[in-house]
């Protein structure tokens, strides 16, 4: 059964227990990797900090503990870190009900979650679903703890054999051929050249890039596509590009630009 409530006085001890079980270096490393990516492309900032929000919140606690030796009241009573506190309580709840072997496997999964945002979203969804049923007073068995079944959760007391729950996390990229990070990385590469060009513009310019399926995954091909797009912007004309891609542009009215500010 996952934790469904906590007292603020428990926060410092809970964070220390989580750091001891999982290792603070995992969320510290996750934050460091995102910040490195952001330094190379500032357009990734909002996206990566949102995707790894739990890691950022836990790393904030890590820094506070390193500085003060504990988590001050002003920090653990800040709503901005509540999601990470819920995550902490839920993870510790699973570990408390695990055998040594099961706990070792779960710790590995939590550590891996800080390496990939998709894994972190999936883990949080399972914890959230388990907490939902626990708040309703039902007993929840986690198959990753009991090592039974092919489902994520078993909610006992519903139906003759309980309710099997399979959790599927759906991100904002679901159904999109071009994922947001790919688009932001491509725009970051374009901006290195477009920023200088934009300074000489005397009117607005809207540019639309169309690709047949997805942006190239190969670094060299993506760089070549970026150069072609920049060349079209310089000439101010659209054209069909290699690989089935195409660029078209049109004047953007100043009134529209004012609305975007």
Predicted stretch roles:
Residues 21, 26-123:
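Interdomain/boundary linker segments immediately adjacent to catalytic/signaling cores
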Residues 107-141, 191-210:
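Acidic-basic catalytic patches of nuclease active cores, encompassing PD-(D/E)XK
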Residues 2-13, 23, 46, 72-96, ...:
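Metal-dependent nuclease catalytic core centered on acidic motifs
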Residues 29-35, 145, 190, 194:
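Enriched - but not universal
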Residues 119, 144-148, 170-172:
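Short acidic/polar capping segments at secondary-structure boundaries
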Residues 133, 153-155, 161-169:
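Conserved catalytic cores of phosphodiester-cleaving nucleases, focusing on short active-site segments
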Residues 1-17, 131, 142, 148:
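Gly/lys/ser-thr-rich phosphate-binding loops in alpha/beta enzymes
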Residues 135-156:
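A short acidic/basic microdomain associated with nuclease active sites
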């Amino acid at each position: 059964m996952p934790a469904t409530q906590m007292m603020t006085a428990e926060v410092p001890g809970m964070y220390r227990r989580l750091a001891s079980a999982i290792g603070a270096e995992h969320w510290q490393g996750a934050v460091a990797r995102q910040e490195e990516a952001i330094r190379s492309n500032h357009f990734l900032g909002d996206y990566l900090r949102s995707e790894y929000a739990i890691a950022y919140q836990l790393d904030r606690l890590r820094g506070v503990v390193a500085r003060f030796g504990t988590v001050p009241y002003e920090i653990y009573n800040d709503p901005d870190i509540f999601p990470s506190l819920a995550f902490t309580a839920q993870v510790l709840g699973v570990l408390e009900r695990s055998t040594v072997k099961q706990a070792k496997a779960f710790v590995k999964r939590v550590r891996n979650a800080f390496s990939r945002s998709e894994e972190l979203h999936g883990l949080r969804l399972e914890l959230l679903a388990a907490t939902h049923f626990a708040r309703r007073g039902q007993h929840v068995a986690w198959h990753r703890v009991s090592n039974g079944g092919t489902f994520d959760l078993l909610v006992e007391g519903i139906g003759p054999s309980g309710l099997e729950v399979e959790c599927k996390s759906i991100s904002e990229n679901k159904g999109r051929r071009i994922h947001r990070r790919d688009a932001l990385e491509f725009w970051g590469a374009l901006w290195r050249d477009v920023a200088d060009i934009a300074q000489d513009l005397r009117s607005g310019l809207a540019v639309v890039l169309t690709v047949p399926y997805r942006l190239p995954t190969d670094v060299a091909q993506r760089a070549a596509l970026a150069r072609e797009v920049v060349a079209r912007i310089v000439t101010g004309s659209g054209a069909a590009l290699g690989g089935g891609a195409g660029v078209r542009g049109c004047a953007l009215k100043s009134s529209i630009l004012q609305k975007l500010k």
